[in-house]
């Protein structure tokens, strides 16, 4: 018997990431090749943005995707989020010239407070929310705090791009395929302070740390390369990473919904105090997923070097959280 369609909301739907994302969702890459979807697409109520969204929708129609059971354009989150099962919050206020980080936090706090309230009011009670728009962890925290009637664990932030970037760097360093790398994960904020950790990682059962055995490379090449990759792409392409961000969003939601079969991945999720991270901080953790639920991998030893790295990214997140507290 055919499955009932799942409703998927995407914000910033006419943007670069939206354009790289929507066709893949409609093709079944995110929720499964047997799962029909209805796309509920949100853009700002600006004539140009709405017109661009219509153009993207025309292209999606022209793909004649068998799994696409419906599609609507919206300018109001209260209608866009109605009964949605998955919400991808991609649209965010980018940092403009001369804008301080505090200005950026407050501009985004307004957007994500409104979207959190709308999800709280009209989304499915089991909605799975992924925040992609930066600063992703803090935006996810704001949305979660603005939706008190939804389970807090339904709100997540995207650390999967950092995770995938780390995988590709390890693959390049070892000369092994990405698919052979297991147990690599990322702690903390989706920012240059994130801590990609391969101390437990293996390739074909062998320790990656022993294979590479180069703490200087780890500290001076690997971590800065992964942490500053977004800036390097802007420098090279003149635009921020869109296709790789869309790909990471698909990976994140697919694994959350369909399960990882015991494989460890990275998700930004609200802490319950694990590994000494204060409750409610939206933090990148190693997780496994099963039956639509994620579970933090517990019992990992955190050495002194790692403790220092985790503290740096936690301090940054605590600073961001303090910077928006008065807006909530």
From Swiss-Prot:
Organism field: Ralstonia pickettii (strain 12J)
Entry-linked InterPro entries: L-lactate/malate_DH (IPR001557), Lactate/malate_DH_C (IPR022383), Lactate/malate_DH_N (IPR001236), Lactate_DH/Glyco_Ohase_4_C (IPR015955), Malate_DH_type2 (IPR010945), NAD(P)-bd_dom_sf (IPR036291)
Catalytic residues (positions): 190
Entry's Gene Ontology BP terms: malate metabolic process; tricarboxylic acid cycle
NCBIfam families with a match to the protein in the record: MalateDH-SF1, PRK05442.1
PANTHER family in UniProt: MALATE DEHYDROGENASE
Residues binding NAD(+), per UniProt: 12-18, 108, 115, 132-134
Protein name: Malate dehydrogenase
GO MF term list: L-malate dehydrogenase (NAD+) activity
Top enzyme class: oxidoreductase
Keyword terms of this UniProt record: NAD, Oxidoreductase, Tricarboxylic acid cycle
Domain of life: Bacteria
Binding site for substrate: 95, 101, 134, 165
Record keyword ATP-binding present: no
Family: Belongs to the LDH/MDH superfamily. MDH type 2 family.
EC number: 1.1.1.37
Catalytic activity: (S)-malate + NAD(+) = oxaloacetate + NADH + H(+)
Pfam families, per database record: Ldh_1_C, Ldh_1_N
Keyword tRNA-binding: no
Job of this protein: Catalyzes the reversible oxidation of malate to oxaloacetate.
